[in-house]
Amino acid sequence: MEEQGNNESAYISSILPGWFSEISPLWPGEAHSLKVEKILFQGKSDYQNVVVFQSSTYGKVLVLDGVIQLTERDECAYQEMITHLPLCSIPNPKKVLVIGGGDGGVLREVSRHSSVEQIDICEIDKMVIDVSKQFFPNVAIGYEDPRVKLHVGDGVAFLKNVPEGTYDAVIVDSSDPIGPAQELFEKPFFESVARALCPGGVVCTQAESIWLHMHIIEDIVSNCRQIFKGSVNYAWTTVPTYPSGVIGFMLCSTEGPAVDFKNPINPIDADDSHTKTRGPLKFYNSEIHSASFCLPSFAKRVIESNAK
């Protein structure tokens, strides 16, 4: 998360002239800006600054500590991919844990899978949940599913108390590795995730941008290869309002039944029963699933070198 969020006056001044500019030490020397039509909400939780504004081109925008988390226009590219890449890679997922994801978008997508019987979500910041329900009802609709059980608290602590082998899938929808999300990128956390997964279980975690964060990605890949004895893969998608316009995901499986992440065996786009309550998929399909694992050469060299 952005250090600027700790200086409230500096942060607010960045949106007063009519433009919001996202500035962070994680992407030095550049900024992405959106025109602000109206500021809808400003608050400070126990963990971070929370802002919602109406933009002129991307609809409503949720910002945490100065960093865009989602916009109404392009949230589908992130929420659908971080959810369906893992869940469409295993047969009949039944128990799913979401770490983070307080806006409810991942819940919305998990709830499309009829095989799922239990959806636990652990989000540390209740303000994010409340604000999302108020301003992003089409995203937060996931909370309305009766299979969802909300745990407000620290995801790291929650995982430590989960019985071994509980979940078929864990989805880690974290913000950037600064502030409250820092621990979600570290080795002990991945060890807890692996322990919570059943044999052949899968995890998908937000894994930064290949254009900006190859040093972070390299560390994540190295840690995951030590911990997850099944498969370790990196995929990516395009999200226009994220830094560099792309965001990546680590997809890993535990030892057990083999998981071929690149070839979905549980295609959600072949089943339209979920569209009545959740609407049609806007971004994900089986073709883009497989294509998301194709990496540019510079990233492929770094990621594959960790396999040796």
From Swiss-Prot:
Q: Name one Pfam family in it.
A: Spermine_synth
Question: Which pathway does the protein contribute to?
Answer: Amine and polyamine biosynthesis; spermidine biosynthesis; spermidine from putrescine: step 1/1
Q: What positions does the entry give for putrescine binding?
A: 78, 173-176, 242
Annotated GO MF terms:
spermidine synthase activity
Q: Which GO terms describe its cellular component?
A: cytosol
Q: Which CDD domains match?
A: AdoMet_MTases
Query: EC number(s)?
Result: 2.5.1.16
A single BP term in Gene Ontology: spermidine biosynthetic process
> Where on this chain does S-adenosyl 3-(methylsulfanyl)propylamine bind?
48, 79, 103, 123, 154-155, 173
- Keyword entries, A-Z: Polyamine biosynthesis, Spermidine biosynthesis, Transferase
Q: Which residues form the active site?
A: 173
Indicate the segments forming the PABS domain, all copies.
Answer: 17-254
Q: Which domain of life is it from?
A: Eukaryota
What's its top-level EC category? Answer: transferase
Task: Give the family, as the similarity comment puts it.
Answer: Belongs to the spermidine/spermine synthase family.
Q: Write the protein's name.
A: Spermidine synthase 2
> Which lineage?
Eukaryota, Viridiplantae, Streptophyta, Embryophyta, Tracheophyta
